[in-house]
Amino acid sequence: RKTDIITVAWAGTICSDPAMLSISVRKNRYSYDIIKETKEFVVNLTTKQLCRATDYCGVRSGRDVDKFQEMHLTPQPSEKVKAPGIAESPVNIECRVTQVLELGTHDMFLAEVVAVRVDDDYMDENGRFDLNAADLVTYSHGEYFTLGKKLGTFGYSVAKNKPQSIAGNNPKHKSKSSTKKGVKAKGRSGKHTRKEKGKK
C-alpha cells in the first residue's frame, strides 16, 4: 500500500507520560485503512508556507493522486516507524496506535509518541520549539489562521516577583536538539539528543 497525506482537523495531546496524542479520521478516508492496518502514522505540523498543500491534502484523495508529488513535498524517513514524515514540516511526530475508539462520524486513534524530529531553525536558546518563529497554521470552521503572538507563560497569573512578557516575541536561535517528556527529539541534523523532564 502506498503512503498518503491526510489533513486532520481533530487532533491533540491526551497524555504527558507516556507522551500520547489522538487523531480522529472518517472511516471512508483513504488514510483510515492505512492507519488501521499499519497501526502507525506521523503528525506533521503545518506552517503558513504549507497552507495551500494542507488544504489540497484535505480535499483530494490518495486513491486518485500522489499528494507528495502534486504538492512537491519530500518524504522524510522516520526513525521509529515506517510511515514517512514531511521534510518541509518544522515538526514530525512519529506515533504508534494503541487503541481505536469508534465514536460516530469519526474513529479516534489513540497513539503513543515514539519519536519527534524538529527543524533546527525553529529552536530557541533553551532548546525548545519557538512557536512564534514557526508561523504555524490552525483551522476552525472551514478557515485557516496563523497562530498569534505569545501572551504569557503558564502560571503567570499567580506568579510573584517575576516579570512576565505579554505578547512578546522569543528571539530566533538555532539548536541541535529539542525535548519532549519521555521521547528523544532530534534536530534535522540528527547529531544530538537529550532528555528533559516535561511540564504538565
What is the role of each PLM region?
Residues 2-200:
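Basic, polyanion-binding surface patches
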